[in-house]
Each structure stands twice: as C-alpha cells, then as structure tokens.
Regions:
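Short, aromatic/His-centered strand-loop micro-motif at the edge of beta-sheets
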Residues: 77-100
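Ligand-recognition surfaces built from glycine- and aromatic
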Residues: 126-161
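Beta-strand-rich, repetitive solenoid scaffolds
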Residues: 33-37, 60-65, 74-77, 102-104, ...
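Beta-strand elements of well-folded, non-transmembrane domains
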Residues: 21-25, 105-107, 157
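Short, solvent-exposed beta-strand-to-loop segments that form ligand-recognition rims
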Residues: 88-89, 114-133
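Short tryptophan-centered beta-strand motifs in secreted/extracellular beta-sheet-rich domains
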Residues: 17-19, 97-106, 110-112
C-alpha cells in the first residue's frame, strides 16, 4: 500500500502540497505516485496510466509507470471519474535523482509543478473531499525490488478563510 498521513485537507479551504522524491538506482519496471489522495491504503491511486483507471475517488498525483511508457504524467480524478491525464514532456525521469513536486488546490481546481516549473492546470478534484499527502512505489511484476525515497513533504493551507 501507499503512504498517507490523514484526511486533513480540503480543496474548498485551499492547500498547497509539496514533496521531494528520489528515484532508485534502476527505474526499469517501476511505478511511483506522489501527490494527494482521498485514500491512504490503496495499492496505488492510479491502476493504469495508459487507460487512466483509478482505485482512489478524488486525487491529484504525478505518476511514472514503465508498464505504460517512460513519461511522467499528472492525473487527477473527481468523484471517482478520472478527469485529466497529462504527460509531462518537460521532465525526464532519471535514476538516483531527486525531484520536487508541488500541487496547489483551490476549490475543485488543481495546478501542478515539477522542480519549480508549472506543468499542469485545469485538472479537477472534489474540493469538499478530505485528502492526504500520498506516495506510492512498487516494482512491476517479475522485477527486482525498487525503492523510491520520499525525502520530504508538507501540506499548508491559508490561515484565513
């Protein structure tokens, strides 16, 4: 299962997620996700990147999955329906590299950044649904162990409403 912290944040209040993840020394046969999700015990918020199917109901995550391709993607879902999938051509995932991810949620609207560069917008989640910071990594079938390191994360929301 992935790692979450608790359902303490809602888009209706607005929040910013930031996380840093370091890829393993081998990235073949690897899947990782980092972002926010409404579940903290799924075996991945996204079942398949290519078909954009999901186990979580409301989420916004960056996904790298070599079962599909070697592109990083940003995928979100609102109310159980995947509403946006976007390959991020500006970022190439490499071995043993640390990436900084950020997701800003205001109401139902989502904006995404990688290493300080805006890479996605107009994605949606259900702003009234509580979410948690989320990270998930696994080796694909038949491959050696893969461990991505979740170096740091934080979620902040405005002190005023």
């Amino acid at each position: 299962a992935g790692q979450g912290y608790g359902m303490n944040w809602k888009g209706d209040r607005g929040f910013l997620f930031e996380g840093a993840l370091t890829t393993p020394s081998a990235i073949t046969t690897l899947k990782f996700e980092i972002g926010v999700s409404d579940a903290d015990d799924d075996a991945g918020a996204v079942n398949g990147k290519a078909a954009a199917s999901a186990t979580a109901g409301d989420f916004a995550v960056f996904v790298f999955d070599t079962d599909d391709d070697t592109n990083l993607a940003f995928i979100s879902a609102k109310g159980g329906t995947v509403v946006a999938t976007q390959d991020i051509d500006a970022v190439t995932i490499a071995t043993s590299t640390t990436y900084r991810f950020a997701i800003r949620v205001e109401d139902d609207n989502v904006t995404a950044w990688v290493n300080g560069t805006k890479v996605g917008a107009a994605h949606l989640i259900e702003g009234g649904t509580a979410v948690t910071p989320w990270a998930f990594a696994r080796a694909r079938t038949g491959s050696a162990n893969r461990e991505a390191v979740w170096n740091k994360w934080r979620m902040i929301e405005p002190a005023f409403q």
